[in-house]
Amino acid sequence: MKLCVALDLASRDENLAIARALKGLDIWLKVGLRSYLRDGANFLNELKKIDDFKIFVDLKIYDIPNTMADAAEVISNIGADMINLHASSGLRAMSEVMNRLANLREKPLVLAVSALTSFSDDEFYEVYNQNIDEAVLKMSQNAKNAGLDGMVCSVFESLAIKKECGTDFITLTPGIRPFKGNSDDQKRVANIVMAKQNLSDFIVVGRPIYKSFNPRETVEKILQEIL
């Protein structure tokens, strides 16, 4: 299991300060929509100059198939090590993205986003007219058939996805709260023990790290727990 630290702070300088504080640790960094729009593609280069971090660019690409493929190609060529697409875009769109990326010299890992962890069961049903478990398995099958590397999902769907798509099909699980505390705007949250039990390959942690008194110490503690 790998730790992916979410860089979701209010400014570029704050995000870079956290990255510098975590230099030398075996982690990935996640650059989300706010940071990418504000700080641009060069922000990835700045992060890699600090410590050659592996970077997950979390933009949840969702558009018509050709536009998705264009966007995925651009992001892949600026140094992303992992990107994601909305599984709701469907099999054809995801397949087109993977066909476009097939000839890249350095292709990133490509994951599909299933049900956002901010959704409650009722909220998901209101939007998709399906329960989460059934919908996520169907999305996962489509992602696997399209040639993607795995899924972004909650811990609660990870094991079922592994059983359906194989243990080598990656699950990246946000909404991880390693210590007791506020779940903030997440509904389907979990801890590290649950992530291990459900065979998560990556866990995403943000606020519990950068809101702590000593972020490096907090990350070191999390890394000990995921061994």
From Swiss-Prot:
InterPro entries: Aldolase_TIM (IPR013785), OMPdecase (IPR014732), OMPdecase_AS (IPR018089), OMPdecase_bac (IPR047596), OMPdeCOase_dom (IPR001754), RibuloseP-bd_barrel (IPR011060). It catalyses: orotidine 5'-phosphate + H(+) = UMP + CO2. Pathway: Pyrimidine metabolism; UMP biosynthesis via de novo pathway; UMP from orotate: step 2/2. One of its GO terms (biological process) is 'de novo' pyrimidine nucleobase biosynthetic process. It is an enzyme of class 4 (lyase). One of its GO terms (cellular component) is cytosol. It holds the Pfam family OMPdecase. PROSITE patterns: OMPDECASE (PS00156). Keywords: Decarboxylase, Lyase, Pyrimidine biosynthesis. One of its GO terms (molecular function) is orotidine-5'-phosphate decarboxylase activity. The active site is at residue 60. Substrate binds at residues 8, 30, 58-67, 117, 177, 186, 206-207. Its EC number is 4.1.1.23. Belongs to the OMP decarboxylase family. Type 1 subfamily. Homodimer. Catalyzes the decarboxylation of orotidine 5'-monophosphate (OMP) to uridine 5'-monophosphate (UMP). This is Orotidine 5'-phosphate decarboxylase. It comes from Campylobacter hominis (strain ATCC BAA-381 / DSM 21671 / CCUG 45161 / LMG 19568 / NCTC 13146 / CH001A). The lineage of its organism: Bacteria, Pseudomonadati, Campylobacterota, Epsilonproteobacteria, Campylobacterales. The gene is pyrF.
